[in-house]
């Protein structure tokens, strides 16, 4: 049986919940990127990060930089969570010719940063509780929703933990091959 590890960064808890659901479905160990877990005993490392301000959290980027040589020798998978319910591509200016990003684009990008032999990557919805946000995140998300999503900032819960669990099961089945 392959040994698997989920490494995640989470700011408000949604990504941690998704990471736990994937770990449960996969039968994997789980660790925060902030503790810099040792990936060497593992055959598969799944990386997870939320998207904030169009980027991954620093702890996951730091983890990936520090472990690049080890990850290059392993199977990897990646997932992101996003506090946006994207029904369409999202860009920064609204111009037709600009580069647009979807949840899947961000998940693919995280997998590329991880290196290694990528098995799969996924984008999952997140949870947004406006009253829990710090001032910087509230300001950034109010701008994002007003100018890019063309709607007011509202709370929502798009976590789909059963889908995250099923994805973990799919990864396990693929590994068992």
What are these regions (language model features)?
Residues 7, 31-33, 79:
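The conserved SAM/SAH-binding core of class I Rossmann-like methyltransferase domains
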Residues 29-40:
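Short acidic low-complexity segments
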Residues 48:
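Short, charge-patterned binding micro-sites
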Residues 25-29, 44, 52-177:
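FMN-binding flavodoxin-like domain, especially the glycine-rich phosphate-binding loop
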Residues 4, 34, 153:
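Generic anion/oxyanion-binding catalytic loop in active/binding sites
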Residues 11-13, 51-54:
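Gly/Ser/Thr-rich loops at beta-strand to alpha-helix junctions
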Residues 2-26:
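N-terminal beta1-alpha1 ligand-phosphate binding loop
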């Amino acid at each position: 049986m392959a040994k698997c590890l989920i490494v995640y960064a989470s700011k408000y808890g949604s990504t941690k919940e998704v990471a736990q659901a994937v770990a449960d479905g996969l039968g994997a160990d789980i660790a925060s990127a902030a503790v810099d877990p040792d990936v060497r005993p593992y055959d598969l490392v799944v990386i997870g990060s939320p998207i904030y301000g169009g980027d991954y959290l620093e702890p996951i980027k730091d983890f990936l930089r520090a472990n690049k040589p080890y990850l290059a020798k392993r199977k990897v998978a990646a997932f992101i969570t996003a506090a946006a319910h994207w029904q369409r591509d999202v860009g920064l200016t609204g111009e037709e010719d600009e580069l647009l990003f979807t949840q899947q684009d961000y998940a693919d990008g995280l997998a590329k940063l991880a290196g290694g032999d990528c098995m799969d990557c996924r984008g999952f919805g997140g949870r947004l509780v406006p009253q829990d946000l710090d001032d910087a995140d509230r300001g950034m998300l109010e701008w994002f929703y007003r100018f890019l999503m063309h709607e007011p900032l509202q709370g929502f819960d798009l976590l789909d933990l059963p889908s995250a669990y099923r994805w973990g099961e799919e990864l396990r089945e693929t590994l068992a091959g």
